[in-house]
Amino acid sequence: MYEKIPLELKQLPHWVGWKYMQHPGEDHKRKVPINAMDGQPAKSNDPTTWCDFDTACRGKERFGLDGIGFMFSGDGIFGIDIDHCYDPETQELDPAAAEIIETVQSYTELSPSGTGIHILCKGALPEGRKRRGAVEMYSTLRYFTVTGNQFGLEYPFSDCTERVAVMHRKYLGEEENAAGAQKAALPMPTGRGTNADMSVDAIL
């Protein structure tokens, strides 16, 4: 199940479990990080609540968790999260998501829902905005669920410092003019996008 997860990530003690939980008054479930050693909530600012990969996998089974996740700590690993960009029924991938995947070229997998994309990278993120529309980029004080369900071309876990700067500027960066700012603020397109078969074989 987790064979495709890069070994370099597995060797780091940044792992947690996670579980779907619904807080009172909310209409959706959150993916809450869980300390896989004791079943209590994990904290992004407390590494003592993280563990090694094998312990996270065992904790998932022991505590009946929904999955495992990776905590970012600002030590040269970051993640890109693109929500609601893939239709598993039609296998259509949003063109903007396809562009980000093709440009960054690092380990890419489907989110637990099967409709989002997570990209895990080495390197440094540019300073500035972390989220705009459906695109998020984080290197610290956040965690990503990790499925091992690799998507598209099997890009290796790579240093993306230079490549991600281009995508950060395009999708998250502050624009110098109002027209540019309005364009950048638009959410990911919701219409029909790129067919995933094409993205795997041709676009990516």
Model-derived regions, located:
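Catalytic nucleophile-His microenvironment captured as a short glycine-rich beta-strand/loop
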Residues: 17, 103-129
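Short Gly/Ser/Thr- and Asp/Glu-enriched loop/turn motifs at secondary-structure junctions
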Residues: 12, 73-75, 110-116
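Short, solvent-exposed loop/turn elements at domain surfaces
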Residues: 24-28
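Short alpha-helical segments and helix-capping/turn motifs at coil-helix boundaries
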Residues: 1-4, 104
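DNA replication initiation modules
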Residues: 5-8, 18-22, 34-53, 69-94, ...
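A short, charged, amphipathic alpha-helix used as a generic interaction element across diverse proteins
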Residues: 54-60
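Short amphipathic beta-strand starts and helix->beta connectors
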Residues: 62-67, 100-105
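Basic, Lys/Arg-rich DNA-contacting stretches centered on the C-terminal catalytic core
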Residues: 29-39, 111-114
